[in-house]
Amino acid sequence: YEFRYREADFGNFPRGLMYGLQMFDSWLYDDEKPFIHVEELKTFAFLKEQIGSGYFEELIQKYILDNPHGAIVVIKPEKGRTARLDKELAERLQEYKKSLSEAEVEKIVADTKELIAYQEEPSTKEELEAIPVLEIEDISKEIAPIYNEELHLADTLVVHHDVETNGISYLSLMFDLSDVPEEQLPYVGILQSVIGMIDTNNYAYGELFNEINMSTGGIGTSLEVYPNVTKVSEKEFKAAFEVKTKALYDKLPVAFQMIRELLMESKFEDEKRLEEILALLKSRLQMKFQSSGHMTAVLRAMSYRSPMSQFKDLTNGIAFYEKVCKIADHFEEEKAALIMNLKKLSEQIFRADNMIISCTSRKEGLEELEKLIRELKNGIYQGTADHTPCILHCEKKNEGFQTASKVQYVARTGNFMEE
């Protein structure tokens, strides 16, 4: 909570606006206490003093364990529900139509045509000109300042961004994926989903989550792609397995310790947990495809011609989903290969010579960084791997995918840089 208070990240909302709204939580009820919800450091200090005094145990006992008010809500899936509801709706509409006279049916048809015509009617010039727009003179020609300084700490490239962060260091450890073979890329997507969600040799994954969040603002993993803007026609890009964390300066040692724990101590041989993660991953991908079908269709269509989109499709798109389904649905037959590939990829990716770091902080945030990087490099995989560049094969297709959604998405893509 103290970390979130210091970070004050309100997403797209202006910080001043959110502080103003927080003030009303007390100001509306006491004119003399408008700032108690924005001056929270004293509250954090008080709560720290109560550790070990029984204060928190009493709160839990009174307001949770002994609370007489509660509710249990169960949501159960029903196979074929959409088809059943569609059939019931069709039957109700048919019965309703039978109850109408011929004139009433004709009126509904006419009203529908009028509505469609109204919706498709283009806006007039006067209506379009009434929409507020920015003039070209309103847009600054100056780019925002870029704070990039290349450093070499512990023989590792560190790109430092010196900006005010209120005592927080934002770190991104980037491991190059350019030498991972194409057929292994779906396993990279699974590896990214497994790390942090499975036990390690020293922690159960729930304990690890608590340990990380007690001392840092979290540790997350992602797969990122960066197009080479100087070689657009060659379609070159860089792909990286990124481990991101944010922590107060004095908590950076814990952050690096936990990163090493995730990368080196994860128990990929835990078959039961792997099966659970795959089932969860399969479900989340299905929900993502249904909630953003337009993006799914565009990515798949782009993968026919773009190596970068092909990479995304293999690690987080339809091709990735098909691989996840195959492993999840035939887990007993696939588990040995899955475990072997996760271990093999970890050794190939998380190497000391395969890492660069991005750090956003003030200069004082760098004081211990070189020592921490050296300790991390000594604790992860050593040696070099086969630096054979991965060549992605794009194949033009014409395909469709069926879902339970009532909305259809059709995508046609191309590259304006090509003839």
Tell me the role of every PLM-derived stretch.
Residues 52, 132-135, 204, 270, ...:
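A diffuse structural propensity rather than consistent per-protein peaks
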Residues 13-37, 99-196, 354, 358, ...:
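His/Glu-based metal-binding/catalytic segments typifying zinc-dependent metallopeptidases
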Residues 64, 162-164, 234-236, 348, ...:
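Sterically constrained small-residue positions within well-ordered secondary structures
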Residues 159-161, 221-233, 344-346, 398-401:
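Short beta-strand/turn micro-motifs at beta-sheet edges
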Residues 28-112, 325-384:
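Ordered core of a single globular domain
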Residues 269-273, 383-386:
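Flexible helix-coil linker/hinge segments at domain or subdomain boundaries
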Residues 1-48, 68-78, 84, 166-265, ...:
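M16 family metallopeptidases and their MPP-like homologs
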